[in-house]
Design a protein with these regions (language model features):
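Histidine-acidic metal/acid-base catalytic patches
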Residues: 4-17, 26-38, 47-61, 204-205, ...
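Active-site acidic/histidine proton-transfer and metal-coordination neighborhood
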Residues: 9-21, 94-110, 116-238, 245, ...
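Hydrophobic faces of well-ordered beta-strands that scaffold small-molecule active sites
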Residues: 35-41, 65-67, 108-111, 146, ...
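Active-site beta-loop-alpha junctions enriched in small/polar residues
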Residues: 42-44, 68-70, 113-116, 155, ...
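Catalytic domains of carbohydrate-active enzymes, especially glycoside hydrolases
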Residues: 53-72, 142
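Glycine-rich, proline-tolerant flexible connector loops at the mouths of alpha/beta enzymes
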Residues: 68-95
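The substrate-binding groove and active-site-proximal loops of carbohydrate-active enzymes
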Residues: 83-87, 116-124, 168, 322-327
Length: 416
């Protein structure tokens, strides 16, 4: 129900003298689903294992976890964590994880977000092989039968991008790399979900371009599906915050996408700064550029801090936030969530906490407060109204089943 329909309904009730607070509350409430709200465990890098992040989920009232399972020797320095032992994951451990999920009323997925098609060739293969390990883990946790997906980036080859037709060449490389990965995953009953962050900080601020993850825009994702011979087990984790700083209404993206491909939605806020000196000087469509510091000062331009201090991530005039925690951001969350509900989205929302006033403080109390606030901010649109307020209906959870599988560990060389 939109605003106009609400006031029309209220006026009709008033005309017959039956306007009551309860009636108005129901009139104002769009049809809610019963979507679980999960936490992404990247905010808990200091927590050592699965059991510790289960406790975090229970602390804040979440219904699940997107378990970050990055390589412990990853070259990434930001927002990484490892909460399952990917090198020693056994059927016994899988059963234990499933048993804990059933006991605690939680559900899970796994993921690691690295560059699979760009960067040093040897590192690309390491990242690809790691995703194959996570596909194996997802299968041992039940895969699609238990709604356990494997989240990943695609990445981007900057060397190819510099050539004529570089974007299409990246599409072709994506097809070459991901076709055997997807075939392997499909054989194990696992879906891969790609996330849409452009990862602008993966290149130094001296780089003129900063598009570093192929599915960073809707057109790219449509082209990815089109170029594959079999896209049946490739889906999306959509994060609206990345489109917000590109000055795109994420509700429009939801309307324009293949909705059948939407498996997860990340909840993360963005506050744009369109009038900052950086935006006024450099524009809002292209990244700030690093130049000689003395020249920058002579020209009277705002200083761009070093990459070591985050300058490579501070080029698009925004800050990460959490909706409902410490003020507003630049996303119309009511519109976005209601758009999803109207289209029948029934899958998990996953809070990714990169809030400057929450996880980025380094304070665990503030991190947990941010998660709690975002759950409460989201609940009135996605949960039914019960006797104790808006709450998730736990009776809708189906028990996770324990598959009797133990796939061997494979590498890209094995799949060639």
């Amino acid at each position: 129900m939109n605003r106009r329909e609400f006031f029309k309904s209220a006026a009709a009730l008033a005309a017959v003298g039956t306007v009551a607070p309860k009636a108005l509350a129901h009139a104002a409430k769009p049809k809610a689903g019963n979507n679980p709200i999960w936490l992404m465990t990247s905010a808990f890098a200091s927590d050592p294992d699965f059991e510790s992040v289960v406790a975090r989920a229970k602390q804040v009232g979440a219904q699940g976890l997107e378990l970050c399972v990055f390589r412990r020797d990853t070259d990434r320095q930001d927002h990484i964590a490892t909460h399952l032992d990917y090198d020693n994951f056994t059927p016994e451990r899988a059963k234990k994880v499933i048993d804990i999920c059933n006991e605690e009323g939680l559900r899970i997925s796994v993921g690691a977000y690295d560059n699979l098609i760009g960067g040093k060739p040897e590192l690309q293969v390491v990242n690809q092989n790691h995703i194959l390990k996570l596909v194996r883990i997802a299968a041992m946790l039940g895969g699609d039968a238990n709604d356990v997906v494997c989240g990943t980036f695609v990445g981007y080859d900057q060397a190819l991008a510099a050539e004529d037709g570089g974007f299409e060449k990246n599409l072709l490389k994506f097809k070459k790399v991901f076709t055997p990965i997807l075939k392997y995953a499909k054989g194990l009953g696992v879906t891969l979900c790609v996330e849409n962050c452009p990862m602008e900080g993966w290149v130094p601020a001296s780089s003129s371009a900063c598009y570093c993850n192929l599915p960073g825009c809707l057109a790219a994702r449509k082209l990815m599906y089109a170029i594959l011979d079999d896209d049946s087990n490739l889906q999306e984790t959509y994060d609206p915050s990345h489109d917000v700083w590109q000055h795109i209404d994420p509700s429009d993206v939801i309307q324009a996408m293949d909705f059948r491909k939407l498996r997860r939605v990340h909840i993360k806020g963005t506050r744009n700064f369109p009038n900052d000196a950086e935006a006024v000087n450099w524009g809002r469509l292209f990244p700030r550029q690093r130049v000689n510091a003395a020249l920058e000062k002579k020209a009277g331009l705002p200083e761009l801090v070093s990459d070591e201090k985050g300058g490579n991530w501070d080029r698009m005039n925004y800050e990460p936030r959490l909706p409902g925690f410490g003020g507003s951001d630049s996303c119309d969350w009511t519109k976005f969530l209601e758009t999803l509900m109207a289209k029948g989205f029934k899958n998990p929302f996953v809070i990714e906490n990169e809030g400057f006033n929450s996880s980025h403080t380094g304070n665990m109390g503030a991190t947990l407060q941010g998660f709690r606030a975002t759950i409460l901010n989201t609940a009135p649109v996605v949960w039914p109204l019960g006797p104790n307020g808006y709450e998730f209906d736990k009776s809708a959870l189906k028990p996770m089943t324990t598959p009797n599988v133990n796939p061997k560990v494979v590498t890209m060389a094995d799949l060639a």
